[in-house]
Amino acid sequence: MAYLGVDTSRIAGTQPLEMLLVSSGSPDPHSTIIIDPRTGVSSWSYKGSELQGASTGLVEPLGHDGEHVVITTKERPLVHVLAVHPKDRFHQKCVLPGPVSAIVSDNSGHFVFMSIKRQLYCWLLSTGELLSVIDAHYQNITKIVISDDDSMIFTASKDGAVHGYLVTDLVSADRDHTVAPFRKWASHTLSISDLKITNGSNPRVLSAGADHIACLHSISMDSVILKASSDRPLTACAIDPAETRIFIGTEVGNIAQINLFQLAPEERDLLVQAGDEHNTKFRVLNGHSDEISRLAINTDGTLLASGDASGKYCIWEISSHQCLKVSTMRSVINTLRFIPFWKTISGGEHVAKFRPVWDLKREPTKCDRFAIEVSTEFNSDQKHWNDVIEETIDQLLLESGSKSSAQLQWDAEGPARNEAAKAEKAAENTIKNIITLGDDEDDAPEVGNQRRKSGKKNKKNRKNQKKNDFEAAVIEKKQVEPIVIDDEEEVNSSLQKKFDALKAENEKLKEINKQMYEFVAKEIVDSEK
């Protein structure tokens, strides 16, 4: 192991922003490691005891959190999933219809896409269901890539074709129609060895094949916008995040750099002599003596990682073309990618947010199972979990066409609501009749006679009479009010008894409903186990 031009003492105590995941196809222990690209120091390694002597195939992280990784076995239909955290002993394995040739996961880690021969499989990891299986190509699939927004998947195969699929079509529960690619490119005549996709809303797809050609495809234009022909078969490719540089690797270990910003607008077909070390137009990096198997560029486009078939991998500084680190492993480099710094690597306290169900089905299903995601924080409130279970069961009842618990409870409380409405209406009518009788209309003739008198005395008498009439009406109302209150209390007392009986019955139904939900939830959990 060699470190060239790096002062490791200055950066030894700082936390890196990104790490480098390296894996070789060797059955030896610690064939999968995670290193700091600045120093080359290994921060995590996988012993490989669960593989039982099988050679490591591909290594794919589930999501961007780095809680779990998927490891395939070379030439065997076995796929393993294990936890990255050193104290987490989670490990499961599954037998698939055949060896996996390519694998990719979405950013959440809930979906995984694998290729077996010429078919593309899509699994939902919260239940283990196989959502779809499509015949993507005429020959075996070699590479799968997914866009950074998880909306598109592109596949490459030995037939020289690149196909693009919408993720929504692959994960859809509709099995009545055949999933068709929305993009088809046949820009190669031989097998495609590598496939890369850029970031952003308008990504580009870079492919390299054994026909000595590398093609840059535009998804929006649905065409090839750049074609580079080499003097040697191409085995790997990479493009930086800014889409300014392209790197292509050959079968003899040379890496050619193409600066896109130096090309003229009319230059669409390039001839690259990757074997010429004195090439002035395209810079050639010479650090390998065997076939380049993997190329990767970090997030800011300053570092290039390369691995070959002999197990040697290098880290280059792109601006100066200087090799910063050289190391070797015991077999071909199958996985080489830059990853963000995972908190699970440090070994601190960590609780997994999600556990994949690795009982992967072999036949497509119709989403007849459901899952409740595990909460990251424990909630001891029993009412909270009862509400969660009730909401889940209500959703299932609505999907099946049945009434939910809220609708059943509303129907059960219907008679009580009708009785309450009738009682309220009867009480309003009683009060209205009593107020009408208290208006003291019997004194109207006397008041009318007094109004027919004239003079100031008559006016004063009328005022006094009105005042006396008003006081008499108030007194009469006060005398009647106790009778109204007594009648209302009798009505309310009768209604209160009915309400109490209905309330007790309602509480009893709620308790039965709660017991039913707890029983159903327990049955679901036991069936999952």
Swiss-Prot record:
InterPro entries (alphabetical): WD40/YVTN_repeat-like_dom_sf, WD40_repeat_dom_sf, WD40_rpt, WDR18/Ipi3/RID3
Subunit architecture: Component of the PELP1 complex, composed of at least PELP1, TEX10 and WDR18. The complex interacts with pre-60S ribosome particles.
Disulphide bond pairs: none
Pfam families: WD40
Similarity remark: Belongs to the WD repeat IPI3/WDR18 family.
Annotated Gene Ontology cellular component terms: nuclear pre-replicative complex; nucleolus; nucleoplasm; rixosome complex
Function of the protein: Component of the PELP1 complex involved in the nucleolar steps of 28S rRNA maturation and the subsequent nucleoplasmic transit of the pre-60S ribosomal subunit. Required for processing ITS2 sequences from rRNA intermediates during 26S rRNA maturation. Required in the soma to promote normal proliferation and prevent germline tumor formation.
Region Disordered, residue ranges: 436-470
UniProt-listed GO biological process terms: DNA-templated DNA replication; germ cell development; gonad development; gonadal mesoderm development; rRNA processing
Observed effect of gene inactivation: Worms exhibit defects in rRNA processing which disrupt hermaphrodite gonadogenesis and germline proliferation and which are associated with a reduction in sheath cell number.
Biased composition (Basic residues): 450-465
WD repeats: 136-175, 287-326
UniProt-recorded name of the protein: Pre-rRNA-processing protein pro-1
The organism's place on the tree of life at top rank: Eukaryota
Keywords assigned by UniProt, alphabetized: Coiled coil, Developmental protein, Differentiation, Gonadal differentiation, Nucleus, Repeat, Ribosome biogenesis, rRNA processing, WD repeat
Protein's cellular compartments: Nucleus, Nucleolus; Nucleus, Nucleoplasm
Coiled coil regions in record: 416-518
